[in-house]
Regions:
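Conserved active-site and cofactor/substrate-binding residues in soluble primary-metabolism enzymes
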Residues: 9-12, 32, 56-59, 102-106, ...
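Short secondary-structure transition/capping segments
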Residues: 11, 38-41, 85-86, 131-135, ...
Length: 212
């Protein structure tokens, strides 16, 4: 779902992979709908436009999922989810996420194991929000650096001080910790103001739990 002509190479590579795997694909240009909105409500903030593009793409995916009685597979990895590096109700929206517990570097390893073409694995990661945008430029750190810190911080439950004393740069550790804290809302369902004894989502058990 490209915007304009900026991502033509990405489109061609995606179509090549779909063809190789025998997967039906459709290319939908989101330019008309995005441009229509910003022609009325103009902005120069690239983040706003990028988020709009991500949500436009997800809106189209959900429409197709309803038409085909299908589930949307998420593509956010553990690194992106922990850092909140994604658009809420945009590329972070899905019904099931098969790679959400794999760090970015692990996704690369899995891709190599599965035979994903080198030109895809070696591409600079980008959300495709604007021409020339890359993940690592946005984050200010490489995924290799980030994942090494996250592995110690999350999986091995090391403290901030332990990470710094073991040789990780204080500035980088603090940046990652702050990103995790500031994006917690993206990893949770919206809180509900509790006004009754039984609150939907909080106190009502799933049907298969009611007999336990």
């Amino acid at each position: 779902m490209p915007y304009g002509d900026s991502f033509q190479k990405d489109v061609e590579e995606a179509e090549d992979i779909a063809h190789t795997l025998g997967i039906h694909s459709e290319t939908i240009d989101i330019s008309p709908s995005v441009d229509a909105f910003y022609s009325r409500y103009p902005t120069k903030k690239r983040v706003l436009i990028g988020n709009k593009m991500a949500r436009e793409r997800m809106s189209i995916l959900y429409d197709f999922s309803a038409r085909q009685n299908a589930l949307i597979l998420g593509t956010s990895n553990k690194t992106e989810l922990l850092l909140g590096y994604g658009t809420i109700h945009g590329d972070m929206a899905c019904a099931i996420n098969p790679i959400g517990d794999l760090y970015k570097t692990q996704v690369w390893q899995l891709g190599g194991h599965l035979g994903v073409p080198a030109n895809i694995l070696n591409k600079a990661p980008t959300a495709g929000l604007w021409d020339g945008q890359t993940d690592e430029d946005d984050l200010g750190l490489s995924y290799n650096e980030i994942d090494k810190i996250l592995l110690q911080l999350i999986d091995k439950k090391k403290s901030r001080d332990e990470l710094i004393s073991s040789g990780f740069a204080k500035k980088k550790v603090d940046k990652i910790i702050n990103m995790i804290k500031n994006s917690e809302f993206k990893r949770r369902m919206p809180p509900i103001a509790k006004l009754s004894e039984i609150t939907a989502g909080n106190d009502i058990p799933c049907p298969y739990d009611q007999d336990k």
